[in-house]
């Protein structure tokens, strides 16, 4: 298993792309149009409304031109990523003091992530957090993405993990305090909170994992996979959970996590199937530690 782990995480190319691909796809599929607009409730799906979770809302526009520019940006579908990025960048350049900066940057976070532009995603995300510290979705996205994009050779490696830990913990702490918006049903609100918490716990778990704190990582990944409402589970969470379980000699738990990963279609299936087999062998020849 150690050889597989070195190939997939330290050499890093395959899993790094997979890590970013999973969170990028989640951000793109979980985003409707701009999260701060308020179209009629019947025109929004549960997943669209789940992406409006924040304590912060923009104040009234300063002038009609700024208002029109924001509405033009807001009207561009999230699926037209290049056009929406261009419009968002033009908006923040033209209106650097706009009261709409937080929602524009919040959208840019998701767009940059979907485009795998991690540095721009982080820059935009940190601007959002400075403007709207209670934007729990942005906190969770930053908290999950930074440790997934991380490698030990980065010049600011320790600082990046510290930031990810702070973002994830803030999202976990703040999400339960968010009041339900009037436009959301109870089901939509629960979905939004659970999506956010799943990302935040995953991010915090990976921070601990990167630091070699496997016992601390395990409950975070367990909570992430427990609350994640997405019908397509993220195999990466089960994969890293399995390795953490194996590292702490919880071989039966490692087999269970590897098996869940192997059941999810995707590039990790062969690796997780092999991991389950190897964890079974280790469990048969080595003493398991109590959970």
Positions of PLM-derived features:
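Short solvent-exposed coil/turn linkers within tandem alpha-helical repeat scaffolds
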Residues: 94-101, 130-136, 155, 176-195, ...
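N-terminal leader/linker segments that initiate helical-solenoid repeat arrays
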Residues: 24-104, 288-291
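Residue-level recognition of tetratricopeptide repeat
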Residues: 110, 144, 148-151, 206, ...
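Short coil/turn linking the two alpha-helices of tandem helical-hairpin repeats
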Residues: 76-78, 112-116, 143, 147-157, ...
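Terminal, low-structured helical/coil segments at or just beyond the last alpha-helical repeat
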Residues: 181-182, 194, 198-203, 207-210, ...
